[in-house]
Amino acid sequence: WTHRAPGYSGVNQEELATDQKRVWGRTIQERIAARFPGRKPGSIRVLDVGTGPGFFAIILARMGYQVTAVDYTASMLEEARRNAGALADKIDFRQMNAEELMFADHSFDVLVTRNVTWNLHDPEKAYSHWTRVLAPGGLLLNFDATWYRYLWDEEAELGHKRDRENLAVSDVRDENAGTDVDAMEAIARKTPLSRQHRPQWDLRVLSRFGIQASADENIWQRVWTKEERINNASTPMFLIEGRKAGLLES
């Protein structure tokens, strides 16, 4: 991920410079507002786990939320601070392992993350920490996909091949251009979630941690660009939305 930081940052910079920042911002803000009606953004503590070059942290800080952003990789955090510009002082950036969050219990009202869970070595441990740091009544928003399932599943492999064929005759950019695909596949082979049926796996685990969770398997239709839809047609993004029980409920 250290080597990917500059390239990944470029992708985030494009998102920040286009309508994607509005699409993603509205998608997240609507769910936060539904969970905390009447509360102003400045009173809501948000943790962005695996912030990477800072896309979520930046758009949420711009909306006025109290934002803390963590990433395991120092170079990603450097890119995030650079991308944040004048907003950098409004975001609490910290280098931290997503599987071992060093925050006190109940520190945040909202936890957001995107394309992180799939590459964790112990995602169940991560979920235990994520739910621990959420305050009672807190909201979890996890945007992810079953990335690299084609390494283990024949049907997914056929879908991946179709994606590459359709991409070759399209007018959109290949998202893998400049990416060390072998290195990314090596990561996927060492982590457990590319082999799992998701988001069903996530919902089962979160239930064990007392989180009422549901999955929106069509969220990709709202948040993905044409380019993303063609590149990743066989691996659609889903949203896991979880709610931690309130004090009276627990």
Give a label for each model feature:
Residues 110-123:
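A short SAM/SAH-binding and catalytic strip from SAM-dependent methyltransferases
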